[in-house]
Amino acid sequence: MGEILGIARFRFDEGKLDEYKRLSAEAMEIVKTKDTGTLQYDTYLNDDESECVIIERYRDSEALMEHAANLEDLSAEILAIVTVVHGEVLGDPSAELRAALADSEIPQLFTPYASM
């Protein structure tokens, strides 16, 4: 077990960019003040601001699960105004994280194959 990476890509529903930006700012504040194992949490917008990519890095599976719990209510609000294009979790997850992801198509889990 070790670091876990997350990649999420959203397309904003029509007219929802400003609401997303407000919710994203709230999420960032929660991450900064409540998460204890989040190492990276970055949001990128494409040129026309119709989509975003979020890059997340966690100390371990427990940290990702803590993050998900901290953002649970806010995540529901965000998911109500976006279409999920894709989501991936990369790493060697704990049994608990693997179980939490088991019934979900998104995010898709990728485990290590080769790295340097």
Task: Name each region found by the language model.
Residues D73-S75:
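A generic local structural motif
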Residues M1-C52, R59-N70, A80-M116:
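Short S/T/G/P-rich N-terminal loop/turn motif that feeds into the first structured element of a domain
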